[in-house]
Structures are given as C-alpha cells and as structure tokens.
Swiss-Prot record:
Interacts with BSCL2/seipin to form an oligomeric complex. GO terms for cellular component: endoplasmic reticulum membrane; lipid droplet. Keywords: Endoplasmic reticulum, Lipid droplet, Membrane, Transmembrane, Transmembrane helix. Residues 62-67, 111-116 are lumenal. It is found in: Endoplasmic reticulum membrane; Lipid droplet. GO terms for biological process: lipid droplet formation. Its main location: endoplasmic reticulum. The chain crosses the membrane at residues 44-61, 68-87, 94-110, 117-133. Belongs to the LDAF1 family. The lineage of its organism: Eukaryota, Metazoa, Chordata, Craniata, Vertebrata. Plays an important role in the formation of lipid droplets (LD) which are storage organelles at the center of lipid and energy homeostasis. In association with BSCL2/seipin, defines the sites of LD formation in the endoplasmic reticulum. It comes from Rattus norvegicus. Disulfide bonds: none annotated. Residues 1-43, 88-93, 134-161 are cytoplasmic. This is Lipid droplet assembly factor 1.
C-alpha cells in the first residue's frame, strides 16, 4: 500500500502539470494576450518577471485593506455629511426658535412701551389743557392767590407806587 501512494501522487502531479501547461498555453495563444505582450508594457513585463510578480502579489494582497479603507472613507464621509446636515438643521432650528422668542419678547416690550407712551401723552395733554385753559373755572386756591395779588396791587396804587 505504501508503494501505491507515491505512484498515485506522482500521477496526480503529472496530470496537474499537464492541465496547468494547457491553461498557460491557452493564455499565451489568446490574441489579446499576444497583442498585449507585443506592446511596450508587455515587453517590459516580459523582461522583468520578478518585478511583475512582486507588483501582482502587492496588488492582490493590498486589495482587501484598500477596499476596507475606501469603504470606511465612504461610510465616514456619508456619516459626516449626514451628521453635518443634522447638526446644521439642529443649529438652524435652535437659532430660529431663539430668534422667534427674542422677536416675540421685543414685540411685547414695544407694545408695552407704546401703551405707556400713549397713556403718558394723553395724561400730560389733559393736564396741560386743564392747567392752561383760559375758560377754566377758578379753584379756591387760585381765587385766594388772585385776590391777594389784586389786594397788593390796589394797596400799591393807594400808596402811589
């Protein structure tokens, strides 16, 4: 049994080598591959197989980390964009409500000041018209003052002043 295993393994390896050779030959006989290998880039790659293998391995191994990085960048950008929109909406809403409260307060203050000013104007104008009206009936106090002034005037006339 031990002798049967190496012969079957060697047969399997030979079969695998034959299949890989056919696959490689089909790639090399492909018209697109032939056209690429005749280009300057293809000739450079044919002259530097180690560099090609290194670049191919680097690109293959870095595809997953670069993909994750780009995914994180896109998700972070979308999150920041949504966050900025939400933050901007929140700031605008808070500022708008603050402005509304301030304007309502200023409206009430201006209404109160207008009312006080109008009441003051009415009271002062009524008092002014009452005090300085020529047709106003004399009050007792004003009558006493007027009579005292008249008496002083008549006394000064009597004395000849």
């Amino acid at each position: 049994m031990a002798e049967e295993e190496p012969s079957s393994v060697s047969r399997d390896l030979q079969e695998l080598q034959r299949k890989l050779g056919l696959l490689l030959e089909s790639f090399q006989n492909n018209s697109k591959v032939v056209a690429f290998m005749k280009s300057p880039v293809g000739r450079f790659l044919d002259r530097h197989p180690f560099l090609v293998l290194t670049v191919l391995m680097f690109v293959t191994m870095s595809a997953i980390p670069v993909g994750f990085f780009l995914l994180i960048v896109v998700l972070t950008s979308l999150g920041a964009l949504m966050g900025a929109i939400l933050l901007e909406g929140l700031v605008i809403s808070v500022c708008g409500l603050s402005l509304l409260c301030i304007l309502c307060g200023l409206g009430f203050v201006s209404l109160a000041l207008s009312g006080i000013t109008m009441m003051s104007y009415v009271v002062v104008s009524c008092l002014m018209s009452y005090w300085f009206s020529p047709s106003r009936p004399p009050t007792q106090q004003h009558a006493n003052i007027d009579s005292q002034l008249a008496m002083k005037f008549t006394e000064s006339e009597k004395l000849g002043l």
